[in-house]
Amino acid sequence: MIRLNQDTPIDVLQDVKNGDLVTDTFSKTGLVEEINISDDGLYRIYEFHLVTGRTISIKK
């Protein structure tokens, strides 16, 4: 299980792939269904959409 939060290194965030089991250490845990990476000019935003319907968002 991969822990995703603000302290997660960028290389770990980039290595997450569909089907990986992830958690935000609070209430969101599940398999990754889709990954979106966007850049707002200041931060790179990683959005991990889980099969449970929840989304874990990390700004780095």
Question: Where does each model-flagged region fall?
Answer:
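Context-gated lysine
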Residues: 17, 28, 59-60
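Basic/aromatic-rich interaction segments and small domains that mediate binding to polyanionic partners
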Residues: 33-58
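Short, charged beta-turn/beta-strand-edge "cap" motif at the junction between a beta-strand
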Residues: 10, 28-31
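Mixed-charge, Lys/Arg-rich low-complexity intrinsically disordered regions
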Residues: 1-17
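Short acidic DE-rich linear segments
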Residues: 2-4, 57-60
